[in-house]
Amino acid sequence: MDRFVWTSGLLEINETLVIQQRGVRIYDGEEKIKFDPGTLLLSTHRLIWRDQKNHECCMAIPLSQIVFIEEQAAGIGKSAKIVVHLHPAASNKEPGPFQSSKNSYIKLSFKEHGQIEFYRRLSEEMTQRRWENMPVPQSLQTNRGPQPGRIRAVGIVGIERKLEEKRKETDKNISEAFEDLSKLMVKAKEMVELSKSIANKIKDKQGDITEDETIRFKSYLLSMGIANPVTRETYGSGTQYHMQLAKQLAGILQAPLEERGGIMSLTEVYCLVNRARGMELLSPEDLVNACKMLEALKLPLRLRVFDSGVMVIELQSHKEEEMVASALETVSEKGSLTSEEFAKLMGMSVLLAKERLLLAEKMGHLCRDDSVEGLRFYPNLFMTQS
């Protein structure tokens, strides 16, 4: 922790923000520091940590101070962490929250997930080393040369040597396991290509395959599920997660919506999506939050809430006038219909059928007879006959 220096949190000249994540707690080695969880920012030059409550409390560490990083999986009651191993602090270091530390590493604990994406972006920055290619303000530079009177260099070299030996041993042990995984990935690639060809054939469908074959192929594709579902572990628990989830929902729901007349209840969507996601189940709250972003992201779907509170997902091209006209035509042909009868005729859920009839009633095209036998809708002759 003695490598951190106080900072304003503002980006320096030629410094670019890469990614940020809320709910990150810092450990000095294995010890939890006094600060509450805050926001961790990764730039091209620094790791910056800012207190979520007191924004004036902000500290940073140059990426040039990092030796290497490693992941630490989550456990029972423990969050996933990124372990950051550091060079010794420079003698001319600017003031920071800690004057000295016995540890040569820190841990970043991700309370609100997002560690997978953050680790990936941090690894990229450590590989590209962009801070060396761009002019860096003097305040960001750290003297990594040997300091007079310091004898810790030998200890650091020894630790690095042991870590390197341990890494080689680990690589040797897991190489055989990855051989099987590589074979599986090759097969997975073939399966993806096969699924794409099947999907294209279904889409074109110019008499090459029968209706029964189409249904069977679609069931195969559905059972295969989503290849790479959006998760909190990848994108965190904030707006970024819900935005990515909304984009994925738009991709997997457009075809089912077109088959169902352009509208589905949120309950149907929830079941369909979770079936496709397999083990990565989605909570109702996350589904609703993602659906609320569909229209703002200019995606082909939108969330609609009826007066009764029923939520549905519909295509942007889905027109209310056409829906009401279809309901009026069907009721006029039969003379009168209940929600159950209308649902059976239209091939939709009773919930959506009732909402469609209520909407037609609200617009004055239908009227109701609410009796002990149930709710029945009739064409509104008061509007059509004088």
UniProtKB/Swiss-Prot annotation:
Residues annotated as domain GLUE N-terminal: 1-88
Molecular functions per Gene Ontology: phosphatidylinositol-3-phosphate binding; ubiquitin binding
Biological process according to GO: protein transport to vacuole involved in ubiquitin-dependent protein catabolic process via the multivesicular body sorting pathway
UniProt main location, coarse: cytoplasm
Protein's UniProt keywords contain Endoplasmic reticulum: no
Highest taxon of source: Eukaryota
Coiled coil: 160-185
Subcellular localization(s) per the UniProt record: Cytoplasm; Endosome; Late endosome; Membrane
Domain GLUE C-terminal: 105-138
Entry comment, domain topic: The GLUE domain (GRAM-like ubiquitin-binding in EAP45) mediates binding to ubiquitin and phosphoinosides.
Quaternary structure, from the entry: Component of a complex at least composed of ELL, SNF8/EAP30, VPS25/EAP20 and VPS36/EAP45. Component of the endosomal sorting complex required for transport II (ESCRT-II), composed of SNF8, VPS36 and two copies of VPS25. Interacts with VPS25, SNF8, TSG101 and CHMP6. Interacts (via GLUE domain) with ubiquitin. Interacts with RILPL1 (via the C-terminal domain); which recruits ESCRT-II to the endosome membranes. Interacts with ECPAS.
The protein's name: Vacuolar protein-sorting-associated protein 36
Species annotation: Bos taurus (Bovine)
